A protein has these predicted regions:
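Alpha/beta-hydrolase fold nucleophile elbow
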Residues: 293-302
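Short beta-strand/loop motif that positions the catalytic acidic residue
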Residues: 373, 380-382
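Hydrolase active-site cap/lid region
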Residues: 310-356, 408
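Catalytic histidine-centered segment of alpha/beta-hydrolase-like enzymes
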Residues: 412-423
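N-terminal targeting or regulatory segments adjacent to alpha/beta-hydrolase or S9 domains
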Residues: 2-182, 443-444
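Gly/Ala-rich beta-loop-alpha elbow adjacent to hydrolase catalytic centers
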Residues: 301-305, 309
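Conserved alpha/beta-hydrolase "acid-adjacent" motif
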Residues: 387-393
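Cap/lid segment of the alpha/beta-hydrolase catalytic domain
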Residues: 213-276
């Protein structure tokens, strides 16, 4: 199996020479159909992609397309509720589109040789997973981690956003299976081997409800997560102890300047290992929380964190409630929807998409697991105008969860932060479980 060269900017594929990007490679098609047709188009695209403002202008036609489609069809999808169009919604759509365009820098684009290598990794993973029976029985892919005890954790104090907190650090202990594609690359991320979580708890030893709040992509720091996950509401208004774990390669575990950058890249096996490790680390964290006399344990995640929370809701039988906010539920589908046309076409040509990726990601898809959380304690919220985690992603999770309570707000991906509707929904959802379980503990 070919190994990727790691480079300082976090692109594990290596290489910035433009000739490499354009030249044919021995392990891929010498001159493909895409090469012949798309050459002039790619030259113009590369010129524009190097300029941040030029990339940001893509938001204008994309926003107009969204508004026009919604006006013509009266809906954002065949089975999705009709959006309530407004200037505010259009502005949030434009914000999402601009952020997406700005994120698509040239160094995030794969080299020509990367397609064959990534395709080979996925094909090898698919073959291995089929032999082991993991694709048909995804539960069996996830090993039960050892419990976490206080003696395993080092604690330090910190301060962010006007609030003190404890920081827990421990050895993750996670490693991919031997000979699993991408395992060596993943284990080379040394800072990722230490798991970490921010803990905000009430003084005293009284039993309390706990919530594990899981951040999204590019987050993982207290000053971001406290606001992004509404820690103050959960802690002060609902009286919960709040734990905010850092996902693999995020926050203190990052290996590049951008938090989480290698997690969501063209190295698709990174996402498989990252999600598997996230589940492993949080399951260990849950064992420690249970030792604290928790009256209930809830999961709340946004975006990428909602994806992880949704997997955990189908694996761990001791979760009392789960809230999936602006969730992702289909990684290969998300990759295709956000990839430029050229990359998408080449990925299909090299048989990365359209079979292998979809099969491999079954082992880390929330749609592969039947939720163990009670139906009336499953909650979803999503935005009509979300361009980062499209509404169809939330719709699929909601349907897979047998259509529990869902709240659709008129906004984009980050619009939930200033949506009173979302805040009220979150407080009502987690407030219910914390009140019920706390009352039951007192009566007992």
């Amino acid at each position: 199996m070919g190994k990727a060269k790691r480079v300082p900017d976090g692109n594990p594929t290596g290489g910035s020479n433009q000739a490499k990007r354009d030249g044919a490679e021995s392990d891929g098609p010498a001159v493909s159909v895409i090469d012949r047709i798309g050459g002039p188009y790619r030259a113009v695209a590369r010129f524009l992609n190097r300029r941040a403002l030029a990339r940001a202008t893509r938001a204008i036609p994309r926003t107009l397309h969204y508004v026009g489609s919604a006006l013509l069809r009266g809906e954002v999808g065949d089975s999705l509720p009709a959006p309530h169009l407004s200037v505010g919604l259009a502005a949030q759509v434009a914000m999402d589109e601009a952020l997406l365009a700005m994120a698509m820098t040239p160094r995030r684009f794969p080299l020509t040789r990367d397609y064959a290598r990534v395709a080979r990794e996925l094909a090898e993973a698919e073959s291995m997973y089929l032999r082991q029976g993991w694709i048909t029985a995804p539960h069996s892919y996830h090993r039960a981690p050892p419990p976490l005890s206080h003696s395993d954790v080092s604690t330090s104090r910190g301060w962010a956003m006007g609030h003190g907190y404890d920081r827990w650090d421990w050895d993750s202990g996670f490693a991919p299976y031997p000979d699993e594609p991408g395992a060596d690359r993943w284990m080379a991320f040394k800072t990722n081997r230490t798991a970490t979580a921010t803990v905000v708890r009430h003084p005293g030893q009284d039993p309390r409800p706990w919530v594990i709040a899981i951040h999204g992509f590019c987050m993982g720091f207290p000053f971001m997560d406290f606001q992004g996950l509404q820690m103050h509401r959960l802690h002060h208004e609902l009286g919960m102890n709040v734990v905010l774990p850092a996902l693999p390669l995020h926050g203190p575990r990052r290996v590049t300047l951008v938090s989480g950058e290698p997690f969501l890249s063209f190295e698709l096996m990174n996402a498989v290992h990252g999600l598997t490790q996230a589940v492993w680390d949080i399951r260990r964290l849950i064992t420690l929380i249970r030792q604290q006399g928790a009256t209930s344990i809830s999961l709340y995640g946004v975006s990428l964190g909602a994806y992880a929370a949704s997997i955990l809701a189908g694996i761990d039988g001791g979760i009392d409630a789960v809230v999936a906010g602006i969730p992702v539920s289909d990684f290969p589908g998300l990759f295709q929807s956000h990839s430029p046309h050229d990359i998408r076409a080449r990925s299909i040509e090299h048989k990365i998409m359209g079979g292998p990726a979809e099969n491999v990601f079954r082992v880390v898809s929330p749609l592969s697991f039947k939720a163990k959380v009670p139906w009336n304690e499953r909650y979803v919220f999503a935005g009509y105008g979300d361009r980062m985690a499209p509404p169809e992603q939330a719709q699929r999770l909601w349907e897979h969860w047998e259509q529990p309570r869902i709240s659709w707000y008129a906004g984009g991906h980050i619009g939930y932060l200033w949506s009173k509707q979302v805040t009220d929904f979150l407080v009502a959802s987690l407030g219910r479980i914390s009140t019920v379980r706390s009352s039951a503990m007192k009566r007992g």
